[in-house]
Amino acid sequence: MKNEIIERFTKYVQVDTQSDPNSDTCPSTPGQWTLAKMLVEELKAIGMEEVTIDENGYIMATLPANTDKDVPTIGFLAHMDTAPEFTGANVKPQIVENYDGNDIILNEALHIVLSPKDFPELANYKGHTLITTDGTTLLGADNKAGIAEIMTAMAYLIQHPEIKHGKVRVAFTPDEEIGRGPHKFDVAKFGAKYAYTVDGGPLGELEYESFNAAEAKIKFKGKNVHPGTAKGKMINSMKIAMEFHAQLPANEAPEHTEGYEGFYHLLSFQGNVEETALHYIIRDFDREQFEARKAKMREIAAKLQEKYGKERIAIEIKDQYYNMREKIEPVREVVDIAYEAMKNLNIEPKISPIRGGTDGSQLSYMGLPTPNIFTGGENFHGRYEYISVDNMIKATNVIIEIIKLFEQKA
């Protein structure tokens, strides 16, 4: 399984599938189509049935049941795109066999080093086979590791018909990183009772709570006058924007929060005297706190409108997704089986809230309860991203074990 999973994963990451929030197409980038076509061919080649790809790049496939029992159909999902924040072009994966616990030189020429001093969790990977970047791109383990693990699990089950299982559905989706993953996902066509996204990080991660999420866009209009004659006339839109930002609680930002704490995050600040635009994301696990955060932003905007004139400030807030716990708690079995699968394989499940969202956050509200399980990756979305092949194999085995447990319990 080791060589098979390395081969799959390193092949996928070499396709640039960075998504683009400024694109209106689906998928948002042509690279995602390139990978999608490869995956469709591979699904057919390993023997999956009902392999389809729709006009929006959503891939679905079936592993038919080989048992007479009435087993609920379950699904596994992973996303094809990589994060827009860091380049995914010309990824050159590097394989570190039997990691010794010391610094890993990612790029000698550029002096880029993956060091346990900066990333102490590297100590957990002594003796593992790691896959890293060459220091100039992200790796794309988020979420091509999930694709490789699902594909390898399906190939294994097809090669081992003695393992009894119900019907399994698989989906590979576009544009998760820009929050659009499930927007055009056909839950009815997928036809699963439960699903799992294989989109988590380190070994043992099992997540069924996500943020409630919104984005806020605030536009400030100023009045530009020659600075030499500006007294009493100029209105500097950037200064109003700074005033807005200064009224948000400084300690409620990503760099000061953890666990169940929510935040306001200023993503971009673009402006000049005449016009400035702020773009925020708002996150909280608690629904009431989430609503209070949005209200706080509107309140600050209203105060500044009073001070500078209503026409000078426009605020728009849009909800993006909600905490999936509300939809998963009532069908707790979907989490319990994943927990048991890990325990059966001597993996300690680590249940924690996702300080982010997955496609599962939205799918759970679309009628498909979808918790998230680990891939084995670390440091997603940047040049220090890496993954343990040993833990990729464990993730693959967890997928197989979940499928076996659903059949055994039917």
Swiss-Prot record:
Entry GO MF terms: metallopeptidase activity; tripeptide aminopeptidase activity; zinc ion binding
Main subcellular location of this protein, as a coarse class: cytoplasm
Compartments, record wording: Cytoplasm
GO biological process: peptide catabolic process; proteolysis
Keywords carried by this UniProt record: Aminopeptidase, Cytoplasm, Hydrolase, Metal-binding, Metalloprotease, Protease, Zinc
Chain positions recorded as Zn(2+) 2 binding sites: 142, 177, 381
Gene3D superfamilies noted in UniProt: 3.30.70.360, Zn peptidases
Catalytic EC class: hydrolase
EC number(s) per entry: 3.4.11.4
Keyword Metal-binding appears in the UniProt entry: yes
Active site: 81, 176
Binding site for Zn(2+) 1: 79, 142, 199
Gene Ontology cellular-component terms listed: cytosol
Name of protein: Peptidase T
Gene: pepT
